Amino acid sequence: FDRIKLTFNLKHDMKKLAIGVDIGGINTAFGLVDENGDLYAESVISTKKYPYVDDYPAYVEDLCDSMRALAQSLSFEYELTGIGIGAPNANYHKGTIETPANLWKFKEGDPNPDESRRVFPLADDISKCFGGVKTLITNDANAATIGEMIYGNAKGMRDFIMITLGTGLGSGFVANGE
């Protein structure tokens, strides 16, 4: 009984970290952060190495392997509380990336260029890599806006607009703190 209690207390006191992922048209960056937004480790993989619809499974495998390696690189124990992903054309409600302009296109002459094949269940795929840990996905510009509102230069602002520019163009709006 004491051993269980001790284990519970150790886990309760354990640092809680999450993985944040930013998927861009050229690179995918990810890092381990705490609830204060402090970054403990970060890494990147090439997104453009996987340009076609049929490359999506290999992309997920590379991302999962790289995220696992990063998660295991820390020299202390911690609890992984969740994974948050920002991606172009992400659907928060479905956990998918849907027909993104700069990702996973059809090869020239693809015999089945049906756009329904360009809906990618990334939140579920990544969650499975980490034993079912809660994984959420949202539009990358919205994720950047939320990050600025909580941790960045817009902290404390109730109204602002954020424009993101990368491989694509995006925006996020905050009105009355929402």
Residue ranges and their predicted role:
Residues 17-59, 98-99:
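Short glycine-rich, Thr/Ser-proximal phosphate-binding strand/loop in the N-terminal lobe
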Residues 88-91, 166-168:
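Short glycine-rich anion-binding loops that position phosphate/pyrophosphate groups of nucleotides
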Residues 53, 57, 64, 81-82, ...:
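Glycine-rich phosphate-binding loop and adjoining helix at the ATP-binding site
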Residues 3-10:
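Short, positively charged and aromatic/hydrophobic N-terminal segments
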Residues 59-74:
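Short, well-ordered amphipathic alpha-helical segments that serve as non-catalytic structural scaffolds
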